[in-house]
């Protein structure tokens, strides 16, 4: 039997405590399994993904990730947090939400540095990634100075590590 990566049990979530997004959701994801979350606008797809990534937490119900209950306390644990962040990522629908540092370069290196990758290795990876995606000319620019196309090109940057 394969390892259970994620399990949502009877999950409820409401934005600002009053706008329901999820109501009694149950979901299991096994190691190696590929899933698709589909539905109309406003049906909670992005909310489920944000919960799976530990960006928000259910109002009611539980989420387990890699055999542990996922909550703010466990994500405060440096060892688990590094393990979790090395396995789970999130690509925002709107690249303006994703790019939050003063320069593109700082935005790209933020994740690996938070995961404990050394400054030297991070900069080496940055050079390879920038050359591969032909974004060397964007590195010193502020995210708000980028075109929509340039921002979309950078939306995959959390996964270059």
Protein language model features and the residues they cover:
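Short helical segment in ABC ATPase nucleotide-binding domains corresponding to the A-loop/adjacent helical element
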Residues: 96, 102-113, 123
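Helix-to-loop junction immediately C-terminal to a conserved catalytic motif
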Residues: 53
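Conserved ABC ATPase signature
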Residues: 142-150
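Conserved ABC transporter NBD signature motif
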Residues: 61-73, 84
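Conserved ABC ATPase "signature" region
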Residues: 120-138
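The feature captures the beta-strand-to-loop junction immediately N-terminal to the Walker
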Residues: 38-40
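A short, flexible loop at the N-terminus of ABC-type nucleotide-binding domains that lies
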Residues: 2-8, 12-24, 119
């Amino acid at each position: 039997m394969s390892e259970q990566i994620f399990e949502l049990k009877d999950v409820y979530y409401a934005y600002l405590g009053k706008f329901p997004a999820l109501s009694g959701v149950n979901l299991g994801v096994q190691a190696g399994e590929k899933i698709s979350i589909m539905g109309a606008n406003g049906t909670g797809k992005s909310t489920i993904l944000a919960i799976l990534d530990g960006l928000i937490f259910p109002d009611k119900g539980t989420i387990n990730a890699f055999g542990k209950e996922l909550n703010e306390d466990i994500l405060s644990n440096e060892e688990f947090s590094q393990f979790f962040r090395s396995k789970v990522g999130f690509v925002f629908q709107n690249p303006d939400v994703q790019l939050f540092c003063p320069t593109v370069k700082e935005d790209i290196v933020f994740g690996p540095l938070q995961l404990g990758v050394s400054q030297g290795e991070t900069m080496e990876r940055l050079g390879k990634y920038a050359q591969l995606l032909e974004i060397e000319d964007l590195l010193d620019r502020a995210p708000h100075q980028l075109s929509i196309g340039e921002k979309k090109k950078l939306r995959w940057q959390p996964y270059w590590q």
